Amino acid sequence: MNRLIAAPVAAVFLAAVPAHAALKVGAQAPDFSAQASQAGKTFSFKLSDALKKGPVVLYFFPAAFTSGCTLEAHEFADASADYRKLGATLIGVTAGNIDRLTEFSVSECRSKFPVAADPKAAIAKSYDALLAVYPGHSDRTSYVIAPDGKDILAYSNLKPDDHVAQTLAALKSWRAAHPS
């Protein structure tokens, strides 16, 4: 019975608390390595390696297989070709375990981009992307990181609606100033 009550109460708190991103535009993005999965296959993801190929869109989400996170994953999957055209690597990160994320990478990310496990939320903490009311879980925060490792966008909003639009706009602006 308590679990039946806890989920709706947590949802109300999550919706009522504004999200924030503390990693400022222009700040150096912390490097990290994590177990990730794409299309059901696990591998090691390292931010500094991805940045050698171009900008990185790093988005944190609270939990796999929740309604908002599923919607957001679908939106990122639908826009994955746009990110590739802009030369960007897209990766989602959450405080889940790799087995659950391997399934999520196929069903909700539609095998279009990787998701990484941050089981102790250390990566989220280094980006100041933790949910204040739900310790150990990532906030819904998106970053665009230039190849030099500098943050060019920090966007936080618990609603998943604008994360794709915000990150694509930042990438297009950066790409216009840095043609290939």
Summary of predicted features, one role per range:
Residues 33-55:
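A short beta-strand-turn-helix
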Residues 17-21:
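Sec/Tat signal peptide C-region and signal peptidase I cleavage site
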Residues 70-109, 121-123:
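Structural microenvironment flanking redox-active thiols in thiol-disulfide oxidoreductases
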Residues 1-4:
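Positively charged n-region of N-terminal signal peptides that target proteins for export
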Residues 30, 55, 139-141:
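Short loop/turn microsegments at loop-to-beta-strand junctions
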Residues 138-180:
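Thiol-/selenol-based redox modules, centered on thioredoxin-like
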Residues 47-70, 74:
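Short active-site neighborhood of thiol/selenol oxidoreductases, capturing the structured segment around
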